[in-house]
């Protein structure tokens, strides 16, 4: 299970989190992690009071801690990385880049993450959240070993005809937006779309596939059973045609219903 929030900076979290955010609560997160081992990743804003202690505790429990919805600059990202924030969620989204304040210029979270060599990133490569130039830049600077793809998809992804029950969001132009058009609210893309988008952006197919399989499995610490086709690993297999459309899928060795167009 991945947890995003509620320990997020309200200035960067977006309207969908309004009224639900707070600083890290030690009693809350320790009791939660002591009662279950299903949480494998937790996203938070490292600049919040208590966030570094939070990261150190999660790291001791083997939980991946990710930078998310943040305004941290270089020194903050450096301290966060040392405390246990080793990954950055939906890179470029919910965080500032290079910016100017009055007559002075400052690096943003984006540049700070690039300068933190050991930190990994994820890209919402749906063709809407990030342009092709940024996808190529991230690939060039972080490389296939430290870059993975993420759909960041809402429940409406791949759900044909699903009724939208949240009045604050709309589906428009192939993406989920806030109803007032103030910002994007999430993706409705599936992973095959992300791979196609990366290839269209000029990324080699082999690397695009690795960023959708092997790299995220390693970042999440499940590469002993996921992310590759090897003996004794989970038999998760996806067959694509030349246009990278799904022709068939197997999960744990079983053909997924309604995916087979091969036979």
Predicted regions and their residues:
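Divalent-metal coordination cores built from histidine and acidic residues
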Residues: 1-38
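Electropositive phosphate-/nucleotide-binding environments in soluble metabolic enzymes
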Residues: 22-26, 45-48, 52, 103-107, ...
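Active-site core of metal-dependent hydrolases
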Residues: 33-159, 177
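His/Asp/Glu-enriched, well-ordered alpha-helical/loop segment
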Residues: 105-123, 139-151, 156-240
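Short, Lys/Arg- and Gly-enriched loop/turn segments at beta-strand edges
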Residues: 243-250
């Amino acid at each position: 299970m991945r947890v995003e929030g509620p320990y997020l900076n309200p200035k960067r979290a977006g309207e969908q989190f309004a009224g639900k955010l707070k600083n890290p609560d030690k009693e809350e997160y320790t009791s939660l992690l002591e009662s279950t081992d299903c949480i494998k990743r937790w996203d938070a804003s490292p600049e919040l009071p208590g966030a570094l202690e939070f990261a150190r505790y999660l790291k001791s429990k083997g939980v991946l801690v990710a930078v998310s919805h943040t305004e941290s600059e270089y020194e903050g990202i450096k301290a966060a990385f040392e405390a246990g924030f080793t990954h950055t969620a939906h890179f470029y989204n919910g965080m500032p880049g290079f910016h100017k304040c009055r007559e002075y210029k400052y690096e943003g979270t984006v540049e700070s993450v690039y300068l933190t060599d050991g930190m990994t990133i994820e890209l919402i490569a749906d063709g809407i959240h990030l342009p092709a130039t940024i996808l190529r830049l991230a690939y060039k600077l972080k490389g296939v070993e430290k870059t993975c793809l993420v759909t960041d998809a809402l429940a409406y992804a791949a759900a044909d005809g699903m009724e939208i029950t949240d009045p604050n969001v709309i589906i428009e132009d192939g993406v989920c937006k806030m109803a007032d058009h103030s910002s994007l609210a999430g993706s409705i893309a599936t992973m095959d779309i992300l791979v196609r988008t990366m290839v269209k952006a000029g990324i080699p197919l082999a690397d695009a596939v690795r960023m959708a399989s092997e790299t995220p499995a390693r970042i999440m610490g499940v590469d002993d059973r996921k992310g590759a086709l090897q003996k004794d690993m989970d038999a998760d297999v996806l067959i694509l045609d030349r246009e990278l459309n799904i022709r068939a899928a197997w999960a744990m060795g079983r053909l997924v219903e309604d995916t087979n167009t091969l036979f």
